[in-house]
């Protein structure tokens, strides 16, 4: 294993055989198959060499073993569930999303996708804000803004037309505060940031819909059926 320059060396992965019920049934199914039977839960790197960035290697004076385990993957194995979204601490967040949206897990594939997106994104957003990141139009803040807006859009797909993500923060905090105590300390702040961003996005959507309605009426009056590139860009930029 190596990443550009610096310490590197041989690596090994530890897989867990989840059993035939997660397999593809093919005779050659083994570690590395695309099915869900064999799950990588641990990675081990034996750091023995130093790469100077030009593929010249020298032996490290101080060798070490660098290891990393997927905590939620281990939970999937220990709880014998289908995916990380079925792990108890994550499913409790999804249940809160269901309570707020009226959509329940297992009803349909499309609804399940939306529930998973909202669950995943609100977890990520809660931790990001706790670590000091705020929604913005560039860098890390832009990633946070995209996560919140995508989650809000999936809320709309489930019939929610008002801010609701901020109401899930308490559940995210409850499920993680034993390991991350600062979540509870900053909960009020996190909730306020998310609600403010949701309200801002709602105003943006409303304004964009008004502009779209005006454009549509103008095109229909002229008998036009195609939006110009300039109009499309204006809608995108709005």
How would you name each of these model-derived features?
Residues 184-185:
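A short alpha-helix capping/helix-loop junction motif
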Residues 190-194:
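Long, charged amphipathic helices and adjacent flexible linkers at domain junctions
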Residues 1-181, 197-235:
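Structured aminoacyl-transfer and RNA-binding surfaces used for tRNA recognition/handling
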